[in-house]
Swiss-Prot record:
Domain named Radical SAM core: residues: 109-340
Annotated positions binding S-adenosyl-L-methionine: 173-174, 203, 226-228, 302
Cofactor(s) the protein requires to work: [4Fe-4S] cluster
Organism from which the protein derives: Helicobacter pylori (strain HPAG1)
Organism placement in taxonomy: Bacteria, Pseudomonadati, Campylobacterota, Epsilonproteobacteria, Campylobacterales
Residues engaged in binding [4Fe-4S] cluster: 123, 127, 130
Function: Specifically methylates position 2 of adenine 2503 in 23S rRNA and position 2 of adenine 37 in tRNAs. m2A2503 modification seems to play a crucial role in the proofreading step occurring at the peptidyl transferase center and thus would serve to optimize ribosomal fidelity.
Sequence similarity: Belongs to the radical SAM superfamily. RlmN family.
This protein's name: Dual-specificity RNA methyltransferase RlmN
Listed Gene3D superfamilies: 1.10.150.530, Aldolase class I
Active site: 89, 345
Keyword Methyltransferase included in the entry's annotation: yes
Length: 357
């Protein structure tokens, strides 16, 4: 089976292609000009070289099969692998953006886009609140399949080449359980699509022994930890992984995470009614994160089919956030985007092609 050209970093292509400058030319065609056929690259390449590319590599290995649009402008995409027909989802989040013009100090309003990518089909972690785990684990995604999610979404929305995306590994799967492919995808996002590592966030459920491995790659990405509880008993009931990597084990590795000045580790905290949304829980969370440069992102539980949990009130979420902020721990409440199309946090899963999304 031919290798996907999107599976190769710039360095790998430079070593493979002769002369090596062909790699940079090819990267421009792939990631700046969105070409999906080697024949469309004839301006730079000879017929013999194009024949070589067609013989050795393939381009697109996934396709969009369904798109659902939310009232807030966000979109959920169902992708199908062209190799094994398995499906997976990704989400485009559309948000308002404000910037200050450095020359006039005027406030400029615009839009920013975040692509929530999947790194696995299904998930092995088995969090009880997450819809993804309902379908079980199928396989890891290749770097090329991760990259193509962003490429196809950008292409589908006619976003200009210069429009920067934010990438969050918060879709289906646990990124640290597919670390090699995730790291390769991050490198290609950076060198190919020109997405700064500062715009890329890797979210983990707490695979503690792989956090230092990710740190050692020196990729410069942002780290997010799915915490969701302030004691091991509650966290283990929500996230079985906690029985192997308990809260203190995870926090010990987070304390070693290299942070740039003014940067913080994000802790995601899913608020579930009458389980972990009390003021007492907020006080315990403050104590847990003492000494860690952190910020807390509160997520109100998003209901899904078969779930036993309930969404808390916005009032209780504000009380939780207000307490943390009053004590100097930066805390925000995440706006639930794409809730009406079941594309919010914890709502993605593999679907059969016959199913509507």
């Amino acid at each position: 089976m031919k290798a996907s050209i999107y599976d190769f970093t710039l360095d790998e292509l430079s070593q493979l292609l002769k002369p090596s400058f062909r790699a940079k030319q090819l990267y421009l065609w792939l990631y700046a000009k969105y070409k999906t056929s080697f024949k469309d690259m004839q301006n730079n390449f000879s017929k013999d070289f194009i024949a070589y590319l067609e013989r050795e590599f393939t381009l697109r290995t996934i396709e969009i099969t369904h798109v659902r649009k939310s009232v807030d402008g966000s979109k959920k995409y169902l992708f199908k692998s062209l190799r094994d027909n398995h499906t997976f989802e990704a989400v485009l989040l559309k948000m308002k953006d404000k910037k200050i013009d450095e020359k006039t100090n005027a406030i400029l309003e615009g839009e920013k886009y975040t692509v929530c990518v999947s790194c696995q089909i299904g998930c092995q972690v088995g969090c009880s609140f997450c819809f993804t785990q309902k379908g079980g684990f199928v396989r890891n995604l290749k770097a090329s399949e991760i990259i193509q999610q962003a490429l196809l979404i950008k292409e589908d929305n006619n976003l200009p080449i210069e429009k920067a995306l934010n990438i969050v590994f918060m879709g289906m799967g646990e990124p640290l359980n597919n670390l090699d492919e995730v790291c390769k995808a991050i490198e290609i996002f950076n060198t190919g699509m020109q997405i700064s590592p500062r715009r890329i966030t890797v979210s983990t459920s707490g695979v503690a022994d792989k956090i230092p491995i990710l740190a050692g790659k020196n990729l410069g990405v942002q780290l997010a930890i799915s915490l969701h509880a302030v004691d091991d008993k509650t966290r283990s009931s929500l996230m079985p992984l906690n029985k192997k990597y308990n809260i203190e084990c995870v926090l010990n590795e987070v304390r070693k995470w290299p942070l740039e000045q003014r940067k913080r580790v994000m802790f995601e905290y899913l608020l579930i009614k009458d389980l972990n949304d009390s003021l007492d829980c907020a006080k315990k969370l403050l104590k847990l994160l003492n000494g860690i440069k952190s910020k807390v992102n509160l997520i109100l539980f998003n209901p899904h089919e078969g779930s036993k949990f309930e969404r808390p009130s916005l009032e209780s979420a504000r009380m939780f956030a207000d307490f943390l902020n009053s004590k100097g721990l930066l805390c925000t409440i995440r706006e639930s985007k794409a809730l009406d199309i079941e594309a919010a946090c914890g709502q993605l899963r593999e679907k059969k092609l016959s199913q509507q999304i």
